Amino acid sequence: MPAKEKTFEESLNALEEIVQRLERGDVPLEEALAAFQEGMALSKQCQDTLEKAEKTLTKMMTENNEEIVFEESEEA
């Protein structure tokens, strides 16, 4: 049975914990690399979730003939 995918909030919290651990600088190299890899996967999952939410909102607003404008992030 596949593992349950984390919610956006769970993923974001896990990502924040990884960042804090790596910023301390006391993590062995192998562990740091594994944590970084996990952080990148969590970051992608969060980004995908946000993009899906934006598309859903855009569709809902379009169906109601309401204008919606999302500003592009400079980080993208």
Swiss-Prot record:
Quote the Pfam families the UniProt record gives: Exonuc_VII_S
Query: What UniProt keywords apply to this chain's record, in alphabetical order?
Result: Cytoplasm, Exonuclease, Hydrolase, Nuclease
Catalysed reaction equations from the record? Exonucleolytic cleavage in either 5'- to 3'- or 3'- to 5'-direction to yield nucleoside 5'-phosphates
The UniProt entry's GO CC annotations, sorted and at most eight, read:
cytosol; exodeoxyribonuclease VII complex
* Single GO biological process annotation from the record: DNA catabolic process
User: Which coarse location class applies to the principal site listed for this UniProt protein?
Assistant: cytoplasm
UniProt EC number:
3.1.11.6
Q: What class of enzyme is it?
A: hydrolase
InterPro entries named among the record's database cross-references: Exonuc_VII_S, Exonuc_VII_ssu_sf
One function term, GO molecular function aspect? exodeoxyribonuclease VII activity
Q: What are the boundaries of the signal sequence?
A: none
Q: Is Nuclease included in the keywords of this UniProt record?
A: yes
Kindly indicate whether the keyword Nuclease belongs to this entry.
yes
Q: Where does the record say this protein resides?
A: Cytoplasm
Give the protein's biological function: Bidirectionally degrades single-stranded DNA into large acid-insoluble oligonucleotides, which are then degraded further into small acid-soluble oligonucleotides.
Q: Assembly and partners?
A: Heterooligomer composed of large and small subunits.
Question: Which family would the database say this protein is a member of?
Answer: Belongs to the XseB family.
PANTHER family assigned to the protein according to its UniProt record, in alphabetical order? EXODEOXYRIBONUCLEASE 7 SMALL SUBUNIT
The protein's name: Exodeoxyribonuclease 7 small subunit
Q: Which organism is it from?
A: Enterococcus faecalis (strain ATCC 700802 / V583)
The beginning of the lineage is:
Bacteria, Bacillati, Bacillota, Bacilli, Lactobacillales
Which gene carries the instructions for this protein?
xseB
